[in-house]
Amino acid sequence: MCIRDSHLPLSLIHTNESVSGITVVDIVNGRITALQAKAIIIADGGFEGAFSHGQVGLGLDLALRAGVPLRDMEFIAHSPLGIKDTNLILPLGLLHDGATLHEASGSDLEFGESTLDEVCQMVSNAKQPVIDARNLGDASGWWNAVFRTVKQRTGIDMSRQTVGIESRPHATIGGITVDEHGRAILSTWSRWFTGLYAAGDASCSGFHGADIL
């Protein structure tokens, strides 16, 4: 089932570890409604918005209050390319295509073969770190859409200017434990919450381990 944008989920309706519907509130008129459903897929993302703006884990809260355990909630993936004073995070592919990192003074931040966590730490320790994507060469055309978004949101033209960055959480690893079919698992792999499924960042299959692959 799919909930309309004008509705917020309140709680799962369930009996004996089997889902039968969901209660929602209409944010336009304030009316609370119960919707019947044979199956519900929670796919609203993780809880990375708890650190800035974005997903806040409403789906995870629904599952937890229904008695579904959450797994690996301590594992959080960070990105070194969050644009300061926005909720924008630049793709790491920019670094592979030739973008460079610097302090505002002009000093280079040499990341070489560093791991992503090491680059995040480097950015966190730097004084006013910036990313320079002005010299991407033939790859620049692939980033036009990203540059347009940044300019619309910040007024900065990345093809001509550097932009301030910061390390920040961008994805959560943990979530609703699921099996290979996406079913929400209870205390053992042989027991699942009938009719409840999870996908994407709301789920935790164990595939990533402690960080995003």
Please report, for each region that a protein language model flagged, where it lies by residue:
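Hydrophobic alpha-helical segments, especially N-terminal targeting/anchoring helices
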Residues: 26, 66, 102, 178, ...
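Structured mid-domain segments that build the active-site/substrate or prosthetic-cofactor binding neighborhood
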Residues: 166-213
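AMP-binding/adenylate-forming core of the ANL superfamily
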Residues: 40-42, 196-197
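Glycine-rich, N-terminal phosphate-binding loop of Rossmann-like dinucleotide-binding domains
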Residues: 44-45, 200
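An anion/pyrophosphate-binding glycine-rich loop and adjacent beta-alpha core
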Residues: 62, 68-169
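Core beta-strand elements of the Rossmann-like FAD/NAD(P) dinucleotide-binding domain
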Residues: 28-39, 192-193
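Conserved small/polar residues in nucleotide/adenosyl-binding loops
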Residues: 1-5
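A conserved FAD-binding loop/helix module that cradles the flavin
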Residues: 49-66, 193, 205-213
